[in-house]
Every structure is written in C-alpha cells, then in structure tokens.
C-alpha cells in the first residue's frame, strides 16, 4: 500500500553516526553534562552564537530531491555548438556507473598513503601516460583545476624555466577568451607584463609564449618556426591544446613546445555548467621539478615489487610553503580518472575514429554552409569553423534559438560553430537548416561526410601511433572493463570500507541523496557559456546556496567561482589586495601567517603578490600574541592581512581570536580566516561576526562534496560588505570580463565547478539549521571522545581551556621514537593492517598524528579505531620491553600483504597471526594492502611517471 510522501527529515540521524543513546554514553565518558555544556567548554564565549541559524527546517530526501528536480527543470537543454574549450561527450556508461557513481572511487582521499591507494594511483598513471603520449612530451602531472588555471600555471612554470630576463609573457590572441582572463588575473598578482597579440606578426622579447593549438576559432597553425624563434631568445614555449585533436594533429612536443596544457573534459566528462573537469599539463623532462600539481610515479615496495606513489612531493605547497611551485592542493582526480578510463575504454583506434569523425563532419558542414553562401574564415580546421555572417547574424541566432541550438557569437558579424562526438547527421542537417532560415534561403542537403583530413595541413598531421601503451588496448569488452575497474577499486581504502580519520580533512559521509542530482541532464548538459535565459535553474541554485553560506558564516557576500580551497584563498587575498589599492594604499603587501598554518596559505599569498612574514606559535599551539604585535609593528604600513586558521590547525579554539582580529584591524590590515576547519563552527560560531573579513570554505569538507581521491573541490570565498566589490569577476557569455570588474576571474568558468553545487545544497536542505548545529556538536564530541579514550596511551599534544579539543586532536607519538624506534609513519602503516586509513602524519607538528573523526562515524567505528590504536601501543610496549626486536617487528614491517604472509619461509621476530589478525574482528572483514611499504626515495631517484611495460608486473 502506498503512503503519502513524508516531508519530515529522517536524514539527520542517518548522517550523524552516534545515536542519542551513544552520545549520552560518550558524554558521560568524557565528563560532560550535555552536548550544549560540551560546546560551552570548547567554544570561547565571546564568539559563541546562541541564536539558531536563519535557515529552513530540515526536509526529507524525497522533498528535497523533488524541489531540486523542479529547479533543474528550469534549465533548458539546447544542442550546443559553442565549443570554446567545452564540448559534448558521451560518458561511457560503464565508467558512469562504476566510477562516477561508485563510492569506492568518489569517497577516497588524496593518495598520500600509497599502500592503500594503488587502484586510483594506477588510474592516474593511465591518465598521465595518455596526456604525455598525446602531447608528445616527457612527463604529465595528475591533473590541474581547469584549462584556464593550467594556462596560468604554464606561465609561472615558464618564468621559472626561462633563460630570458624579460618580464614579458606573450599570449596569443587566438587563445580562448576565458583563458586570457584567468592568465591576466594571475599575471597582475605576480607583476608579470602580459602582451596579447597575433604571433604571426612576430614575438616581442619575452620569457615565455602561450599559443592555442588549434586556435579558439578553428585554425590549425604550424608553429615549428615560431617555437625555434622563441627558443633562440631564451623563451619557453607553452601551448593550450585539445586531446581529441591531438589524435590527428602533430603533438606539440614534436614541433617544439616545452609545455602543453588544456582540459580533458571532452574525454567523457559532461559540461556541468563549467565543471568540474580535469585540467592537464605535460612538459619536457627539464621542467619536471618545477611542474605544479601532483605527480604519480613508479617505485618499488619493501618486497621489490612495482608500486606507485606520489612523486617529488618536496615541490608541493605542504612542504615548500611560499617557495612552492604552486598553491595547488586539491586537483581533479576523479575527473582525471574518468578521462584516463575513457581512453582505456575506446583504445587508440576508438579515440582516433572519434577524432576522424568529428573532423569529417566539420568538413561536411563547411561544404554545406559554403553552398548557402556563408564565408568560412578559416582555411584549416579540426572541429571549429569561424563564419562571417554579417548583417544576417541576428536572424541566424534567432533561427538557432527557435531550433534550441546554441552557436558561439564572436561579435556582431561573426559566428563560430564547434562539433563534437555527440553530433549526429540529423543534428548537422538541423544546423544547416538554421543557417538557411537565417539567410532566407532554401534548405540544402548535407553532403556525405568524406573520410579525409583536408582541414589539417599536411605539415601538421600526426604521423605516429597514439596511446601505444598496452593498457590502452587491454579492454576488448565491457566484461573486461568491469573487472578492470573492480580490480582497481579493490586495491583502495575509501569511506565505503572504513573510517578515514585524517585531521584537517573532514572525511564525512557523502550521502547518496546528495550525489544523485549531479548526473541529471538538466545540470550535467549545460554549457558554461549558454545564454542566461537557459540557466534560471542554475541561477536559483547558486543564489540559494550563496545565501545559505552567507547565513552560516555571517558574511555579506560570496563567490562560488573558486574550484578548490587554495583558489578560494587566492581569491580572498586578491580581494584584500584590490581593496587596499582602491583605498590608495598599494604598499600594503605583507601577509602575516602563523608558523602552524597549512602550506597553501603562504603559497597563495605569494601568488597574490604578497610578502610573507611568519608569526610564532606559543607553547600551547596558539598564535603568540606578543610576537604578532611585534610583527605588526615591524611591517607597519605594509601590513595587508593576517591569515589565521580557526579553529587552529592544532585542533583548538584560540581564546584570543577576537583580540587577534582587533590588533590587525587597528593596524589597518584585514583578517583572512581560513575556513578549512569550518566543520567545528557551523551553527555555533560565525567568523563574519567575530572579527574576520574574509574566509574560504571547503565545500568538499564541511558541506559534503566528496574528495574524489584528490578532487574535485569547491572553495567559495565569503567576505564582509566592504570586500564584496572585489570578489572574482564573472565572465559574460563570450568568456570576457566586464571592463568595470575590479578583480579578474580565478577560474575559467563563470561559476567554477557548478556541476557539483547540488551536493552542498542538498546537504544543507536535508540538515536544516538544527541538523547543521548538531553535526558540529557531534564532530566535537567524537574528537573529544577519542582524545579522552587514547590520552592514557598517547599524549594529546594540545588542548584548549577545560582540557578540551575542537573537532580534531593531535596524538604525540614523538617520544616513542626514542623508547622503541617507532615513528608516526610506522604507526600509520600498521593501521593499514587493522583496516584503517592513517590519520594525518606530521602536520601541523612533525612526528605526530592528527585525528579528525567527523560527526558521521558512529560509536562502534570509533571504538574499532580506539581498539586498534591501543593494540598498536601494546605492540610498541613489547618493543620497549625487549620482548620484540627493535628493527624486525610488526610496525617496522607494516603493512603486511597476503603475499608476504603466505611466503614459504618466515624469519620475522613475530608470528604471522599477529601480523595478519592483530584483533579478532579482522577475521570477519579483512582488507589486504596490495603492496608492502613503498620506497619513496627510490621512486624519486628513479623517476618514472608513465605506465610500466606489462612484464614489469610479472
């Protein structure tokens, strides 16, 4: 019997792990009278919010999804020929169902622990191999945020690698408009002089060149001589390119490019109104140590078997800080995995066949339009035609609108059309009919497409094979693909298997109801530069989510454009810099940053053109107020901002936060409060109301966008009213910035990774004000419960007043190194034998473990983790007492693979049973790490960042 839809929310107790009874048990165990009393003990009274958030009450999953379906239906799905870096594509259903919609893939964390990440590392290595192969360059990274930011990163890489002393970077006018705008924003912050022009007229003296290959408006140029001329003056040559086109045109590496960047979007990832999509970068070997982003490399494990891991990590912001190659932290791993698997699914013949078909259909369209008297401006092409439509332009656009077709309007007299793999002959005939109607002519039949490469000059046609590694020819059927994906997923630990207690990462539940809408066509199939009249549903979503986030944070304005937390930091600092400049204080360019801050903070400040001055921490892990005042006095009128993480990276609410904000404001500076730890404040404190001027939020932490193995993320930047005019500029439908905008864009799409904004929207709607506050309270309860239960076994390094922590705690394992020889890394690897992902290692304090359980983990899982940590402490005690060998023990040899434990001979100073099943529950449900401990140093000394030959795994 059917029943009426229930509008009451039962989601809150499904999102929050501990039941009411369990919460009561935990509160009693830590000596707190109630959740409210615990929050009073943890959160400073001066910042504690007592009034409930002005948000609607929690709603049911059915109600929220129906409402979102109504919102999505307001968007209009047109046939898109806009191109401009975004193209229609068919996501292979086997990838859609088994990767994008599979929590084994989307709930994983960045693969910093390689032994439990071999599946997604292999998928990323496929992606890197694909990019390096198609671009003809030596090495590729594991993804960047989008094409525009990849181009900006190419500019900074060129500056680091150039022999020229020139401050000029030349950018071709043939680049996509949005790329020009993002590069311009980056150049202004770094003091780089940008020259935009037509490269065919010669190059100025410059340190680097950025070309588009093929051109944004269709042409395919031969850049060999230009590259030689650039190299002759010491300049580095970068190009923005298209992976599908590279199946047919000469790889950039062969004609002289040093760096290639672009978007892998058209390899199986939908528009999503602009993202998320994986940007790519490849380069010559000489630039590898300066290349931004993560890099998957091949190494070996302790048994001598091939093993994958993240290579050359000393380049990254979490180690190099303001000297890092980039501020990038989160990238676009899930989307890079999908793009790499698209190549595996289609194989070299399939990818080339798709490219040939697109090029052939473009040629047929060109012939049909010529028959109508339309002048095609470009003599060369892959998928794009530039059409001189003159006074007929408005009529053609009107006819296109009637046919629900989007064309790219270049200006008042020119249109452009880009084809993709989804275009059918019927689509093409409808497109030709639109032009006939707009021109007032009779319809003409589309000529039969010809299997030729007439649009590509012979000099730049690709001669060699593509995707030559056997992995791209290994899949012959969907059965093969399904089993390959299962094999990869089984190698990894994600939230679908176990708690991931990573401090500063907030690995909470990514509920199925939150994920469902992202693949709805009304959200997934919208081009980022579609006319505003076609996207009212997205506008409602963006405006609604923006208002909710402003209410939650206490800020007045927000931009959802930044597509990572690091980009949000960058955008916030650009706003501060522009604000000071508008006030006639351009000298304010010093950013104060506590020594304990996450590495993205100083890296972002450097990108925004600021000098970094470090502020010391006191013995309790708080900002040293005396040192802060001394640094403020030291920099004087140069003070631009203070960046502070709150609660602190040490896992405590600093009591003096309002005093810190006041000191900065009195000196004329602005306060940037890093919102990475917002999961400890939602509903209990609002940074915009206790002294902060700007924050970024990590929607992939606090608001349930999954980490995806290292991306996607969304990092909105929220500001008080006086900074609102300086939020990132929003591009128009042509990808251009309003001349009145005070700050440029930080992402290529107007609203960043808009395609995943339904996730936080659904989360907030399902939780309501009360549920959001309760989630914060339970996150704090869970952290304090773990701290209390483990305090007798491992010292908790920092605590606030009343001995409480915030939403995470730092376990100090440093003394164990002296008493037993056991390090934080050894404990992390041993936890894998217990079926756990390790806590955060050595941040913010070297040699420690930082644990963040989140509100989504129930008491049973917390107890399982506590049991494992106590058992490991007992194993360490055996070493301390001399019962077990100091060098040959279960921790130093961890993790243990099945292959190790099934070896014919066993010579270790402990039994196999202890290695495999240290607690009884593992006999029922055991995760086996696929490789033993990975040798990181070997991998960096012998750098290989592409797929190994098959025989290497024999």
From Swiss-Prot:
It comes from the Bacteria. It comes from Bordetella bronchiseptica (strain ATCC BAA-588 / NCTC 13252 / RB50) (Alcaligenes bronchisepticus). Its cofactor is pyridoxal 5'-phosphate. This is Glycine dehydrogenase (decarboxylating). The glycine cleavage system is composed of four proteins: P, T, L and H. The glycine cleavage system catalyzes the degradation of glycine. The P protein binds the alpha-amino group of glycine through its pyridoxal phosphate cofactor; CO(2) is released and the remaining methylamine moiety is then transferred to the lipoamide cofactor of the H protein. GO terms for cellular component: cytosol; glycine cleavage complex. GO terms for biological process: glycine decarboxylation via glycine cleavage system. Belongs to the GcvP family. GO terms for molecular function: glycine binding; glycine dehydrogenase (decarboxylating) activity; pyridoxal phosphate binding. NCBIfam families: gcvP, PRK00451.1, PRK04366.1. Coiled coil: none annotated. The gene is gcvP. It catalyses: N(6)-[(R)-lipoyl]-L-lysyl-[glycine-cleavage complex H protein] + glycine + H(+) = N(6)-[(R)-S(8)-aminomethyldihydrolipoyl]-L-lysyl-[glycine-cleavage complex H protein] + CO2. The lineage of its organism: Bacteria, Pseudomonadati, Pseudomonadota, Betaproteobacteria, Burkholderiales. The modification N6-(pyridoxal phosphate)lysine is found at residue 701. Its EC number is 1.4.4.2. Keywords: Oxidoreductase, Pyridoxal phosphate. Pfam families: GcvP2_C, GDC-P.
